Curated annotation (Swiss-Prot):
It catalyses: 2-deoxy-alpha-D-ribose 1-phosphate = 2-deoxy-D-ribose 5-phosphate; alpha-D-ribose 1-phosphate = D-ribose 5-phosphate. Its EC number is 5.4.2.7. It comes from Psychromonas ingrahamii (strain DSM 17664 / CCUG 51855 / 37). The lineage of its organism: Bacteria, Pseudomonadati, Pseudomonadota, Gammaproteobacteria, Alteromonadales. This is Phosphopentomutase. It is found in: Cytoplasm. The gene is deoB. Mn(2+) 1 binds at residues 10, 354-355. The keyword Metal-binding applies.
Length: 415
């Protein structure tokens, strides 16, 4: 009974991307920076070892189970520096390596799609202007067709900061908050109760329709709760409206072969539900891990369980919350033995990421990095698998493991 579990630690990059200097960001003062030298795992470990991440936790980064699976060595091979505080003498029990991205961008959709065999080789559309970011004709059509009293924002912003700045005005006026970032996204924040969750979803569906001509990857519903700027909080009812992958992915291949694909968290949204046979909602690291365990307990033959642990990225990476990211990794690490205990000799466990989001880096955006490529199971020979030339090597390996047709991109670790 062959089953694969993919645990994707959203944004947990391992540095080393040779093209990182091509990814340029800009700060509020107009100064620019690039991603060269960014290393999510490496820098978290470094700052923990220096005592600079002691809020809510203490001391060196403690992730013995991830290290035993090869994360430390994968990071060292990717970036030439072994993560500080991790034991370099531990002999990994998994196949470990790192993969470079051939997609043109460093966003969520590009990373996930490339992992499943469909790299994004075209350019996404972006709303580049920091202020007055969206085309006026788009805004006018949204106001008219959705019968809105107007809108707020229309800028690049951090999702938490914009709630502090505009949340109270939104409550008073009923105007939705429109904002974007360096990613190919149109984000809409509305109060879950006063504006209404279903109304927000319908507004996002309309927006998805209207931004297609701009080649925008995702429209994201960002519902929040609270009564004042001091207590506004995003709820767990985020919903992403993605374009469909441009060609069939590993997930569709498994579904078409008669197998099952169980998505947990935002995976179903990222793939626009393509190739998904069961979508399980969960919010927060604990619930996501619990759901992963529960689905594995009941999964049958030829099943892929795919979980995105979004909190690493959304709660800690983008917010540049170093101690929070470290504490979340340590929590995840403590839960890993539960997953390993459920694995049978016919199962495959894959741990990876979709991009970086170094909490020590400038700005608030993703960082261009290699991702870890970790494979654990009876069918896997432990040891180094080196640099993988594309994220798609991960999907190709899973296809090979399940005896599915070869994907268009990637080389299997089993071949």
């Amino acid at each position: 009974m062959k089953r694969t579990v993919i645990l994707l630690l959203d944004s947990f990059g391992v540095g080393g991307a040779a093209d990182a200097d091509k990814f340029i960001g800009s700060l509020a003062d107009g100064s620019q920076y690039d991603d060269m030298g960014s290393n999510t795992l490496g820098h978290i470990a470094e700052q923990c070892a220096k005592g600079n991440a002691n809020e809510g936790r203490h001391g060196p980064l403690t992730i013995p189970n991830l290290n035993k699976l090869g994360f430390g060595r994968a990071c060292a091979e990717s970036s030439s520096t072994f993560p500080a505080g991790l034991d370099p003498l531990v002999e990994p029990i998994a196949a470990y390596g790192y993969a470079k991205e051939i997609s043109t961008a460093k966003d969520t959709s590009s990373g996930h799609w490339e992992i499943t065999g469909v790299p994004v080789l075209f350019d996404w559309g972006y709303f580049d202007k920091k202020q007055n970011s969206f085309p006026q004709e788009l805004l006018d059509e949204l106001v008219e067709r959705a019968d809105l009293p107007g809108y707020l924002g229309n800028c690049h912003a951090s999702g938490t900061t914009i709630l502090e700045d505009l949340g109270e005005e939104h409550l008073k006026t009923g105007k939705p908050i429109f904002y974007t970032s360096a990613d190919s996204v149109f984000q809409i924040a509305c109060h879950e109760e006063t504006f209404g969750l279903e109304r927000l979803y319908k507004l996002c569906e309309l927006t998805r329709e209207l931004v297609n001509k701009y080649n925008i990857g995702r429209v994201i519903a960002r519902p929040f709760s609270g009564s004042a700027s001091s207590n506004f909080m995003r709820t767990g009812n985020r919903h992403d409206y993605s374009v469909k992958p441009p060609s069939p992915t590993l997930l569709e291949s498994m579904k078409e072969s008669g197998g099952q694909v169980v998505s947990i968290g935002k995976i179903s949204d990222i793939f626009a539900e393509q190739g998904i046979t069961k979508a399980t909602k969960a919010n927060g690291l604990e619930a996501l891990f619990d759901a992963s365990l529960n689905e594995l307990k009941q999964a049958g033959d030829q099943t892929i369980i795919f979980t995105n642990f979004v909190n690493f990225d959304a709660d800690f990476g983008h917010r540049r919350n170093l101690p929070g990211y470290a504490a979340a990794l340590e929590y995840f690490d403590k839960r890993l033995p539960e997953m390993l205990a459920l694995m049978t000799e016919d199962d495959l466990l894959v741990l990876t990421a979709d991009h970086g989001c170094d909490p020590t880096w400038k700005g608030t955006d993703h960082t261009r990095e290699h991702i870890p490529a970790i494979f654990y199971g009876h069918a896997v020979k432990p040891g180094p698998i080196g640099l993988r030339e594309t994220f798609a090597d991960i999907g190709q390996s899973i296809a090979d493991f399940h005896k599915l047709p070869a994907l268009a991109y990637g080389k299997s670790i089993f071949s």
